[in-house]
Design a protein with these regions (language model features):
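Conserved acidic carboxylate
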Residues: 6-8
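Acidic phosphotransfer microenvironment of two-component signaling modules
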Residues: 10, 33-37, 101
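Conserved phosphotransfer microenvironments
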Residues: 13, 35, 48-70, 78-84
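Acidic, metal-coordinating helix/loop segments flanking the phosphotransfer/catalytic sites
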Residues: 31-49
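C-terminal output helix
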Residues: 98-109
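The C-terminal output helix
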Residues: 108-116
Length: 116
């Protein structure tokens, strides 16, 4: 699976990317803090889902979706990630809103620090 994350919040990008890799081993992630770069990066690739910051990347998301009509759109927000129902249903591991707390918990578990 190929995912794209687009946000000007680099910490959020890194955290989300690490969580996706943990939950879906073998997935490919393209991180972009620049929406226009993301669009260029995607022009020739099949993408399964685009995780985009709805506040800063609304126009880019629209262009990305026109180029990759089969891609699911997942919007990053202050509370976490809002996933479309179709994506959540087909990927049960991501069927809940991914909050920052859940990301940190998953990363602690990944690093063997679950009890800390």
């Amino acid at each position: 699976m190929t995912f794209v994350t687009v946000s000007d919040n680099r910490e959020q990008l890194a955290l989300l990317s690490r969580l996706l890799i943990t939950l879906i081993p073998g997935c490919t992630i393209h991180q972009n803090s620049n929406p226009m770069r993301a669009i260029r990066c995607l022009s020739h690739q099949k993408v399964d889902a685009v995780f985009a910051d709805a506040d800063t990347c609304a126009n880019a998301v629209e262009v990305l979706h026109k180029q990759n009509t089969q891609a699911q759109l997942c919007f990053l927000c202050r509370q976490g990630v809002v996933l479309p129902k179709e994506f959540a249903c087909s990927h049960s591991v991501l069927s809940y809103p991914i909050t920052e707390q859940k990301m940190r918990t998953a990363l602690r578990r990944e690093n063997g620090l679950d009890g800390v």
